[in-house]
Amino acid sequence: MKGEEQLWTILNDKLDMLRATNRLPQAIRAAETALEIAKRAFSGTDLSLATSFEKLGQLLDQKGDRAAAKGYLLKAHTILEKVNPPDQRAIYRSARRLAFLCDSLGQSEEAINFYQKAIAAGAEIEDIHYSDLGTMLNNVALILRKSGRQKAAEPCYLRALHIYEKQLGPDHVDVASVLNNLAVFYTNERRFTEAEKIHLRALAIRENLNPPPLADIAQSKCNLAVVYHSRGDYAKAAELYQASLKMWEQVKDKPLKDYEIVVSNYADLLSSLGQVRKAHQLEVRARKKRSG
């Protein structure tokens, strides 16, 4: 048994070296051999066995065989969940990897389950970066929204905001980005009063930064214009669309996708007000900028 444990250690070192030098097929073969040895040398709840399942799963994922990778990563995670006391860092790492994998495979419910496990474990670890938790909460919210569960999505946005504010304070640029996501969610839900309030806060944060992030400010002004546009306050919407366009034109000579969104929204507003010629002129101008 001792000899097999030593051989397992040697093989793991070898596969790490092979992986580091981009010799993926050889690394996978070494990982498969190491796993067979681990099954003989270690108990079914030993962390070394979990390591072997995990490493082979990672290599298969790197190869692009995500379906096969998932099976090995699930076996590793099952072992990690049985360890007492639990290793929260290992559970976080494993659940996070499975969440992103399931998400990429379109397995939404499993992805939500593993995102939630990773978030719960990550909350117990002091040095987990706030943006990692925020990204996972945002991903859960997107899955829930796509499946029509808007009410369930809102707490994810609110929790992400709480995490960012706790780590960074209320006036940080990253807090403004989270506020923007929340406000867009409220706009889509036609909760315009809440959306307006939060967009105004995000805009204020961005405008007070030095140097001011012009693209972010342009985005905030466009999003706020959408709120006013949606509830029929066309004068405010037009003013903000114009301001957003002006800022986008300062960002780059050629327009970005966001610039074209503002053009489209503003042109729709002008057309709805009977200003068809002005809307056409705006679209022609945008096409000229797009063509350089």
Residue spans of the language-model regions?
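Amphipathic alpha-helical segments of tetratricopeptide repeats
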Residues: 35-40, 77-82, 119-124, 161-166, ...
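Short coil/turn linkers that connect adjacent helices within long alpha-helical scaffolds
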Residues: 1-2, 40-44, 82-86, 124-128, ...
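Conserved alpha-helical positions within TPR/SEL1-like repeat arrays
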Residues: 9-20, 47-62, 89-104, 131-146, ...
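TPR-adjacent "capping" and linker segments in tetratricopeptide-repeat scaffold/adaptor proteins
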Residues: 1-10
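TPR/TPR-like (Sel1-like) alpha-helical repeat modules
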Residues: 241-246, 264-291
